Amino acid sequence: DNINRLYKNLGNGTFEDVSVASGSGIAVNAMTTTLGDYNNDGWFDIYITNTQSSQAGNGNVLLMNNADGTFTNVAEETGTTFNSFAWGAVFLDADNDTLLDLYVSGGFDGSIGSFLSAAFYHQQNDGTFVIPQNIGFENDTRKSYSNAIGDINNDGKPDIIVCNDIENNFLWENKTVNENNWLKVKLEGVISNRDGIGNTIEISIDGESQYRYTLAGEGYLSQNSFYEFFGTGTATEIDFIKVTWTATGTTETINNVDVNQAIIIKEGSGILSNTDIQTDNFFSMYPNPSNNGIFKLSISDNERVSLQIFDLSGRLVTKKDDLRNNDEIDVSHYHKGIYVAKISSGSNISSIKLLVN
C-alpha cells in the first residue's frame, strides 16, 4: 500500500506503526508535514501537503487530533485543501488574534487555470479558514518549495520567508495594523537539548490556553525561528506560561507575565533577562563529575550567591545561601546521576548540569 505512516514512540527506543488505527494513514503524495494546535484544545494537529497529480485526490490534508489517539481529516470542512501542487506549509498567528493561520507554498506559478501558486489561510472564529483578498499576497505567483517564519524587525508579528524555484526568494514582512498584543518565547535546555526542540509551551489567559511545540525542521527544507510566537489578542497579561521539558518529564510554570516582549526560558532557571544572557557563565562547579562527593564553587566575581540544586524530576534537593568563591558543596548523600545547579546573585542567574558519580 502507499499510505503515509505515523509511528508512535513507545519510549523504549522502538516505534509502533499506528497509521491505520489512528486514521492518519492517508494515501496522498505527501510533500511536507507541519504541526500546530489550530483549535487550541491542547492536542497537536497535523497538516500534510499534497501534489495536484495525486491519485488519492488533489487536496491537502488537515488531520484534527481527536484527543483519543485518532485523527480526522477536516481539510474540506475547514477550507484548507489548497487543490494545487503544494510544498511547504507553516502555522502562524499572523494578526495575533490567538488563532493560528496557515501559509502554503505551491509548485505552480498561478498561470495554470485555478491552481494556486500559494495561499495564506486566515482562521475565522468558527474554526474555518478563508483566503483574504488585498492584503499583499497578490504577487505571490512564483513556484516555491519551502517557507519559514521569524521576526525580522522584532515587532512581535511573524514574517514569512519563501524559497522560490528560479526567481529570487520572497520575504513577506508582516505589516498588520491592529491593537493585538503578543509574546515570543524561546527555550534553552540544560538537561534537554540547548535549542529546546521537542518541548511544549502552554500559555493561559483567562482560562484559555494556547500551545506550541518546537520542531527540529519545519516541513520541507525549512527551519522556523526558535522563538515561538503567541498572539494574545487584547490581553495585557498572561496568567501563566508552562513549559514541559520532554527529556525529564518535568514542568516549569511562570506566573503573571507581561505581553509584548520576547523572553528566554532556561531549563531550571525560569526567565532570563538580558543580564542573565550576558553573564551566563559567571560561575562553575568543579570537579564535574564530582570527586568524593564534593563540588567546589567558582565565581567570576567574589560576591555572595544563592545555590539551588534540582534532580531530574525537578525536586529541590539542596538550597544554600550566602556562598562565596571556593566554598565546598557536599553531595556525598546524593544518588548517582545528573542534577541541575542554579546560582543567583542579584540580577545574575545561571544554571549548569552536574554529574554525581
What are the residue ranges of the model-derived segments?
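Gly/Ser/Thr/Pro-enriched helix-cap/hinge segments flanking short amphipathic alpha-helices
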Residues: 110-113, 128-279
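Hydrophobic beta-strand segments that make up the repeating blades of beta-propeller
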Residues: 1, 46-51, 102-106, 159-164, ...
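C-terminal outer-membrane/trafficking sorting elements
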Residues: 206-210, 277-357
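Hydrophobic loop/turn residues within beta-sheet-rich immunoglobulin-like superfamily modules
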Residues: 38, 94, 152, 233, ...
